[in-house]
A protein has these predicted regions:
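Alpha-helical substrate-recognition element adjacent to the catalytic core
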Residues: 2-145
């Protein structure tokens, strides 16, 4: 069953005696509004100028192919901040988690995520990010601490 925030919560009990919930959370814009930028080029006065955009801005400009394109027309360059081999390396995800929390950029499923952690429930993270499990785990451990 999914709620309005995209949170999936399941109960695998045939009787109501022993109830175990497990959760699946989509990270970006659901748990935290992350500051991670997408590297784009914006056509201004006939010249393509580098311009970084947020994930929410990307949702708007991605379909404007006349005025916006991926940096160097290369997805690897444009989305390098969403991987561990980008310019900030393996700490990129953790750094962005710290920034989002310090700026109180909590997204709609944040409270459910915290409740899940407090209750020791099993959960999974759904994401299009290319981070390895270890850096993502560091981000979750930072939240737990």
């Amino acid at each position: 069953m999914s709620d309005k925030n995209g949170l999936t919560k399941s109960n695998d009990s045939l009787n109501n005696k022993d109830v175990m919930f497990y959760y699946s959370f989509d990270w970006d814009n659901n748990i935290l509004d992350m500051p991670t930028k997408i590297h784009m080029e914006h056509l201004i006065d006939g010249d393509w100028m580098p311009e970084d955009v947020s994930t929410s801005d990307f949702a708007i400009v991605r379909s404007d192919n006349e005025n916006w394109r991926l940096l160097n027309n290369d997805p690897a360059s444009a989305f390098s901040e969403f991987r561990d081999n980008g310019p900030r390396g393996e700490d990129a995800f953790l750094d962005d988690v710290k920034i989002a929390i310090s700026e109180k950029k909590f997204a709609p499923s944040w409270d459910d995520f915290i409740e899940c952690i407090i209750n020791g429930s099993v959960f999974s993270i759904i994401t299009a990010r290319g981070h390895e499990p270890r850096p993502m785990r560091k981000g979750v451990e930072y939240i737990i601490r």
